[in-house]
């Protein structure tokens, strides 16, 4: 970790620390359910995988819903690429959804929130949170049943010790704000 992380002038300030874990949450405008159908959720997941790879962000966990998403990723050496990466993701998915709905220029995304995860406990708690978000929203009974997130892969492929650490991680007061109500599919 650098002694003086790069900052983006924002309130609260955004920290850009190379090779650090970040959690990002984004919401659609007015929490509208633009991604309610399965094909739209697939579109959102595929775009997230594509865009994070293009910017050198290593995805650790993700979950996409009808009106929001969460992801955790490790930043590249230039962590300040977060903003243009999110702008590209939002632009690409908004254009695609607008094309599907036969409209142009409609705003789809409202904004995003990012958190720099600087402790192992925070990282494990957020992994747990992202993977279990579909359960929280009562879309599935077990996280690995939700096809639009990484929980199934994590359950099948992650080292058992890591799975146990994540499972045991307790949410804390800095848990992400999430008052979304995804549409039932």
Task: Place the predicted regions along the sequence by residue.
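Short catalytic/metal-binding and nucleic-acid-binding patches
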Residues: 1-185
């Amino acid at each position: 970790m650098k002694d003086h992380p790069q900052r983006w002038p924002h309130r609260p300030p955004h920290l850009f620390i190379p090779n650090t874990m970040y959690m990002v949450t984004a919401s659609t405008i007015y929490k509208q359910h633009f991604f309610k159908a399965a094909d739209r959720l697939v579109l959102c997941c595929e775009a997230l995988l594509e865009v994070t790879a293009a910017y050198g962000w290593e995805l650790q966990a993700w979950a996409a819903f009808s009106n929001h998403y969460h992801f955790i990723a490790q930043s590249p050496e230039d962590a300040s690429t977060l903003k243009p990466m999110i702008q590209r993701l939002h632009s690409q998915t908004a254009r695609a959804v607008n094309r599907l709905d036969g409209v142009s220029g409609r705003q789809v995304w409202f904004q995003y929130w990012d958190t720099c995860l600087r402790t192992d406990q925070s990282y494990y708690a957020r992994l747990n949170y992202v993977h279990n978000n579909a359960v929280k929203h009562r879309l599935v009974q077990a996280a690995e049943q939700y096809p639009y997130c990484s929980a199934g892969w994590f359950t099948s492929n992650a080292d058992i010790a890591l799975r146990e650490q994540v499972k045991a991680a307790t949410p804390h007061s800095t848990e992400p704000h999430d008052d979304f109500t995804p549409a039932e599919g």
